[in-house]
Amino acid sequence: MDRSIAKMLSNQQIRNFSRGVGHLRRRAAKNNVIKVRPEELRPFFNQYSVLPNGIQNDADAKLFSKELQPGERKLLFDALRKITADQYNDHKKVVEVTIDHEDLVKVWYINFIPMFVYGCLDEAFLIIGGESINNIFSVYNGMSMLASAAVANIICNLFLQLPADRINDVLGFKKPVLSVDQMNIPEYQYAAFGAKLSGLWMGLTLGMLPLFFIDDNLDNRASDNGDLLVSVANTNGDEYCELFCGD
């Protein structure tokens, strides 16, 4: 009886009957009214198909996907992805996303520490490296102090990126587990930006400590002393000539 009913119904009628769950629908055939359960009229899942109860586990999903052609799989994947995105957007509109205070503190530290270490080492190596490069290369090619600082800055930026990024793992700081929505809210953005800005500013300020141990006026004093000795020698020479040679 069920097989004859399925043959009598068209695909569109089957789709119409399959809309709705848990109640009986009626189909008029000539003068008789036949009661049909919607579960028995599902186009792809019925008692005559391989999956009579629908897709209930991974094995059923794999079996169903194997029966599809590559083009059909792509169309089905796009449709499922669109439905999932629509459901996600609807859920996003309803649920208010927040971050706990402890997670915000962790976000602050994991952004503050790398920038602080990077700023401190970069500034210190820039000062020390610029001084060393200037002392080495200025003798041979006349490199200026600004050019030496630029070369030192390039070297520091190339070799300090990786250690600064891994400093959190070395110190044992773990990133908080946050969703994409939580990482897109303003609280997360403000905490991360403020931590990076503060860390870089404090690191660069602390990195200027080598300036207290570098004598920048050494060359100027040596030049001034040399000029002083030359002028004294010239003065003494003139007085010696006046004394013994006369006018």
UniProtKB/Swiss-Prot annotation:
The chain crosses the membrane at residues 108-128, 136-156, 194-214. It is a multi-pass membrane protein. Keywords: Membrane, Transmembrane, Transmembrane helix. It is found in: Membrane. The keyword Transmembrane helix applies. The keyword tRNA-binding does not apply. Its main location: membrane. It comes from the Eukaryota. GO terms for cellular component: membrane; mitochondrion. This is Uncharacterized protein C03B8.3.
